[in-house]
Amino acid sequence: MLELAKETDFEAVNRLARQVTAHHAQWTPELEVVEHPYPMDFFLACIKPDSIRENAIYVMRQEGRVVGYMRIYLWNTNSTVSAKRTILSIDDIGVDEALRNQGIGTQMMAQLTALAKEEWGCSSICLYVDAPNESARAYYEKCGFRVRNIGMTLRL
């Protein structure tokens, strides 16, 4: 079940975040794999009941064990040319590399979609994915995501 992380999930979430960071470092070499990608003070801020507006960490459990996580937040459009709406942004998502391709990510995404729609009143979910990460892009498309924007980076 997908739920807001607890303080006792600190090490498990950081272990998964290290896996994700190591994977992404192949496309973003300046990423540094550190012991705690989410330091304790940041982690604690992300697990407060009202943290969804800033940064919230949700975990997926199987038999009591953390097998996946997401760092997410809500934001509202603030435009004079479009309708006001609430959007859920996924900043990080990871499933234990030993358990990938077993449907855990699909379950996480389905449960997150239900929360976004029913609990938080979101009109959409957005995320960014590294362009060379073809397996992630295919997974997100399978979940119903469509390319909307193309981000670009100029390395200095």
Give the residues covered by each predicted segment.
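A short beta-loop-alpha structural element at the N-terminal edge
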Residues: 1-16, 24-26
